[in-house]
Amino acid sequence: GATYDVAMRFLHEDPWVRLDLLREAMPNQNIQMLLRGRNTVGYTPYPDSVCRGFVQEAAKSGVDVFRIFDALNDVSQMRPAIDAVLETNTTVAEVAMAYSGDLASPKENLYTLDYYLKLAEQIVESGAHILAIKDMAGLLRPEAASKLVMALRKEFDLPVHVHTHDTAGG
């Protein structure tokens, strides 16, 4: 998500040139990027036309897979990016659920398995090619991961990817 910002602000590089150089150096590798839904790689929501134009340019420059998410799991905020990726007819929409809470805990009453299954249904209906779990805070414990992945695989006929962090070191 912050790749473009970091390239410009800290490395003083053109992110589009950087992407072209990466594609040239790795011609037979899939290149994936993170899109913050309607915010693309920025920090504010953009009009659909800007989102579409960004995705078209990124695809032309060699991005193959777009992992699309919204920090609040608002599929309507992801929709412009999903639609833009689908319109390319050449790239993959990996749409991610931002994981929070602990669905394996009996005390959890918001981020439950049912919550994630309903969210996944919206994501699948949006046209996603891949369903992803984005555990950016490192909260996804093995028991919860097992329950969630098994339920998603049982319910939906899409590949399921898990992206997690272990920032606490546990």
Per-segment meaning from a language model:
Residues G1-Y4, L11-I31, R36, T40-V162, ...:
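Alpha/beta enzyme core
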